[in-house]
C-alpha cells in the first residue's frame, strides 16, 4: 500500500506519521521493510520535512498464511482501502479448531488472490458464526488500525425475532461477563459495560420483530441482553429454549471512511420481518 502527502510545515517524518494516526509499530515496519521517499528520494524517519516536500511511504507486503477457499462472497461495497461483505449465517468469521478452513477469512484470502492483493485479513467488526449480515474488512493493517481507533463511532444495527410480546422500545445497560472456559456469557457486575437500544417493529402472536443499535460490541451482546429481560432470540438454544437456529442479522452499518472522511452508510435491501 502506498500513501502520499504534501507537507505544509517543518516537522520530522516520524512525528508527521504519528500525527496521521500511524502507530509506532507500523512506522517501524515501514522503516525496516517498506520505503520512505521525500521528493522521490529515500530518507529515514529522522529526516526533517520542509514545506512543499512530497512524502511518500510504501507499506511492506503482508504475508497471509491462511489457506484460500473458494467460497462465494457477497460484496456490498468495495474501494481501494476496505470492503463490506454480507456474511451468511453458519459461516464462521475466522478459523477455529472446529472450523479450520471454511470461514469468511479463508474466502477473503481466495478473493485477495484473484485480485492480486498481498494482504492479511483485517476484520473490523466480527460476527458470530450463526449471525448474518454486514462486516467491514480493512484491506491493509494501517486502515484496520485507523478504524479500530474509531470503533466506538461505527453505527451497528441488527434485527431479529425475539420470544414473547414486547410493547415498548427500550435500552438495556447491563454488564456482560464470561466465566473462563465457558461459551455462555452472563449478566454480572464483574463484566464489561454493555449497552443495547431496541425498537419494536412488528408484534406477532408468539414473538416480536425487533431492531437493535449497539453502543458497545460485546460477544453475544444482543442475545444476552434480550434473554436478561425475558425475551431471548427465537431459536436461541444457548440463552433460550430454541433449537439453535436464530435470525439475528446485521442489516446496517454507518462509519466515517478512514481516508476520505466521508460518511458511509450501508443498508441491506433484504428484511427478515
Positions of PLM-derived features:
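RNA pseudouridine synthases
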Residues: 1-273
Amino acid at each position: 500500500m502506498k500513501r502520499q502527502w504534501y507537507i505544509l510545515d517543518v516537522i520530522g517524518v516520524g512525528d508527521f506519521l504519528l500525527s496521521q494516526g500511524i502507530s509506532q509499530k507500523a512506522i517501524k515496519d515501514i522503516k525496516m521493510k517498506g520505503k520512505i521517499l521525500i521528493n522521490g528520494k529515500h530518507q529515514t524517519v529522522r529526516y526533517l520535512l520542509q514545506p512543499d516536500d512530497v512524502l511518500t511511504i510504501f507499506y511492506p507486503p503482508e504475508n497471509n498464511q491462511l489457506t484460500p477457499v473458494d467460497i462465494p462472497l457477497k460484496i456490498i461495497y468495495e474501494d481501494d482501502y476496505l470492503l463490506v461483505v454480507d456474511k451468511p449465517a453458519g459461516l464462521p468469521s475466522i478459523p477455529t479448531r472446529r472450523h479450520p478452513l471454511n470461514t469468511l477469512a479463508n474466502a477473503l484470502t481466495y478473493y485477495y488472490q484473484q485480485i492480486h492483493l498481498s494482504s492479511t485479513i483485517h476484520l473490523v467488526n466480527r460476527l458470530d458464526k450463526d449471525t448474518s449480515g454486514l462486516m467491514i474488512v480493512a484491506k491493509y493493517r494501517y486502515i484496520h488500525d485507523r478504524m479500530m481507533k474509531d470503533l466506538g463511532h461505527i453505527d451497528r444495527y441488527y434485527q431479529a425475532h425475539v420470544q414473547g410480546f414486547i410493547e415498548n422500545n427500550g435500552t438495556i445497560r447491563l454488564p456482560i461477563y464470561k466465566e473462563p472456559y465457558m461459551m455462555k456469557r452472563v449478566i454480572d457486575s464483574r463484566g464489561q459495560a454493555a449497552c443495547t437500544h431496541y425498537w419494536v417493529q412488528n408484534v406477532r402472536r408468539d414473538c416480536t420483530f425487533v431492531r437493535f443499535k449497539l453502543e458497545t460490541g460485546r460477544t453475544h451482546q444482543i442475545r444476552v441482553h434480550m434473554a436478561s429481560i425475558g425475551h431471548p432470540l427465537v431459536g436461541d438454544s444457548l440463552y433460550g429454549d430454541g433449537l439453535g437456529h436464530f435470525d439475528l442479522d446485521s442489516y446496517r452499518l454507518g462509519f466515517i471512511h478512514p481516508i476520505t472522511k466521508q460518511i458511509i452508510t450501508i443498508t441491506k435491501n433484504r428484511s427478515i420481518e
